Amino acid sequence: MAGFDWFWKALGGKQGRNQKRSLAIVDQAEAHTRDLEALDDAHLAARARTLVGDGTPQDPAELLAVLGIAAHRTLGMRPFPVQSQAVLRLIEGDVVHMATGEGKTLVGAMAATGLGLQGKTVHSITINDYLAVRDAEWMRPLVEFFGLSVGAISETMTPEQRREAYRCDVVYGSVSEIGFDVLRDQLITRRADAVQRRADVAIIDEADSVLVDEALVPLVLAGNQPGHAPRGKITEVVRRLKENDHYTVSEDRRNVFLTDKGAAALEQALGITSLYDDEHVGTTLVQVNLALHAQALLIRDIHYIVRDGKVQLIDASRGRVADLQRWPDGLQAAVEAKEGLAVTEGGRILDTITLQALVGRYPMVCGMTGTAVEATDQLRTFYNLHVSVIERNNPLRRFDEADRIYATMAEKNRAIIEEIAHLHHTGQPVLVGTHDVAESEELADALRDLDIEVSVLNAKNDAEEARIIAEAGDIGRVTVSTQMAGRGTDVRLGGPDESHYDQVVELGGLAVIGTARHRTARLDNQLRGRAGRQGDPGLSLFFVSLEDDVVVTGGAGESVTAQPDATGLIDSNRVRDWVAHCQRVTEGQLLEIHSQTWKYNKLLADQRVIIDERRARLLDTDLAWRELSERAQDRAAGLEGVDREVLEQAARDIMLYHLDLNWSEHLALMDDVRESIHLRAIARETPLDEYHRIAVREFKTLAQQAVDDAVETFRTVVIDDRGAHLEDAGLARPSATWTYMVSDNPLAGSGNSVISGIGNIFR
């Protein structure tokens, strides 16, 4: 394997973190296993604690051996050498590339246990509550074997239940719930009210989904102060506008532009002289643009569904309903108005944090995914994380057929149906990956017209996903699914109990069909990875048309000539190379979006750290009382009869109230600046530089204003033996709060999000 050292270095592996060293340690672990198996449980657990007595493993090979023996005794699962290698790489802080079905759950639990034995608090981060609870219960015997505690966080838990879970050595939780708890803990006024304690390590499952696909998704904590819903009149007027007459849409359907005729129609209907007057640019024009985006670009059953009278967003990277997500308030309200639903108020944002900033809070981060190699650049650039490739336990027997490329989408769709029907006729199970709800349902209807029974897994029925996926490998099954990333359940050949395994193997295993290329090869490979699990046979095949989104977007401004046959099929390596080029272009666009958006978010994230540090000092010391009593000595002197502890808490409540309020107002201001910042390009100002200039200036004002406001309140508010009567002074904190995730780019993959594209209305 030494010949592959160059490959490891290309992936960012540091010297010493290479295949050769890892495999040598795993071989040593195998030798240790024979000696250690004679120990009883108590002595084996004691040996593990001895190995990490000073907080670092004295002998990594022996620690791997102990963990492997314990896994076998408690779970009946003996790790393969490649799994032990993955455990080692996680413990040393890498992201491991492990194929689907290679046992990531066990690997993560062994690594968490090994790190827990070193005295570290470990958060094992999943993508949803179901997997967090499932994995915690499944792996509990292994963790507890060594006297460590394990807990799980889920959405329905009370603060006390969360507090108890976070006290554990190993905590399983979804990335959103852990993030929301961070935000809620930033509103406490007494340290004892915090639910979390500082964690040392994050082990992230589906690391590329969390660290790349959703890195810039903001988690939001909001309070019950009404926001501003867009005016209904604008929605009604925009609804009457006609495409190509009143507005035009860009070729990639990512941006919409008002024509002069459209602007005139709006001005007449709204009774204003010009949309572009100063009084309307930051208000009416922004609302018009949001309504236009909602009307022309956001499509029901592709970007969202309507269920139970509510707009529910579809997570583009997973093809399921994003229960906790909403768009920025103006856009959310615009879509609700478009669908004739009750417009929800967004409330006042109290605090927010992106997943990328959340992950940055952990001193050590590692993770697992089946498609880490494709995300190497992003992982190294944004997180300084290195990728370690773990070989399969059994050789890959999946056959990846060359793409079948068609001239038109109609010809492609016809060929897809014919291929599925052909495979189904043989009895071979077929898993079809589509891009959105509408496509999955149209394809399923077409197959049912051919009397083919179809199971559909999409955002409308994701509650059934575990059952549908488990059955997808049985004889004659046809399963149509939106994105397969992070589904968390393996497709087993022969059905859930593998009773028809031999017959399905004889038929060639699971056949995976992609109805189009994704915007990144990584998502294609996530779908491919469902076939050929643990050495099983399998087939993967992608269909592409020259009208597909990835080709149109990635090939914009360029062209390719090709001669299709009578069915529309283009059998040309040159065209296949062209399609791959188009995909690379869209991948580059996504990386640029990430880079640009992070530049906007980074400064706020840095400012947030300063706020966190200030908050911690106010919570944990008497700083608030010292500052206020010094600034308002006469008031402090008049409170000498009040108990010192009460005074310190009263000062703390006052200081924290105004710090939190000013931070919330700063976030709202910077959100407004961000929405209109691209208008500054018209004035030949650099938007990013101007945004940073405003953010720095306003943050300096925030710091001083928070203290000045607190001093003024301290001078006037009633303070007695019960503390500061802030509510009586009209300074109550929100009586209700709620959390959600903001889908900042509903047209994910475009060069402009709805928000960053406000200026585009000027054409």
Swiss-Prot record:
It comes from the Bacteria. It catalyses: ATP + H2O + cellular proteinSide 1 = ADP + phosphate + cellular proteinSide 2. GO terms for biological process: intracellular protein transmembrane transport; protein import; protein targeting; protein transport by the Sec complex. The keyword Cell membrane applies. InterPro entries: Helicase_ATP-bd, Helicase_C-like, P-loop_NTPase, SecA, SecA_Actinobact-type, SecA_DEAD, SecA_motor_DEAD, SecA_preprotein_X-link_dom. It is found in: Cell membrane; Cytoplasm. Gene3D superfamilies: Helical scaffold and wing domains of SecA, P-loop containing nucleotide triphosphate hydrolases, SecA, preprotein cross-linking domain. ATP binds at residues 83, 101-105, 490. Its main location: membrane. Keywords: ATP-binding, Cell membrane, Cytoplasm, Membrane, Nucleotide-binding, Protein transport, Translocase, Translocation, Transport. CDD domains: DEXDc_SecA, SF2_C_secA. It is a peripheral membrane protein. GO terms for molecular function: ATP binding; protein-exporting ATPase activity. It is an enzyme of class 7 (translocase). Its EC number is 7.4.2.8. GO terms for cellular component: cell envelope Sec protein transport complex; cytosol; plasma membrane. The keyword Hydrolase does not apply. Belongs to the SecA family. Part of the Sec protein translocase complex. Interacts with the SecYEG preprotein conducting channel. Has a central role in coupling the hydrolysis of ATP to the transfer of proteins into and across the cell membrane, serving as an ATP-driven molecular motor driving the stepwise translocation of polypeptide chains across the membrane. Monomer and homodimer. Part of the essential Sec protein translocation apparatus which comprises SecA, SecYEG and auxiliary proteins SecDF. Other proteins may also be involved. This is Protein translocase subunit SecA 2.
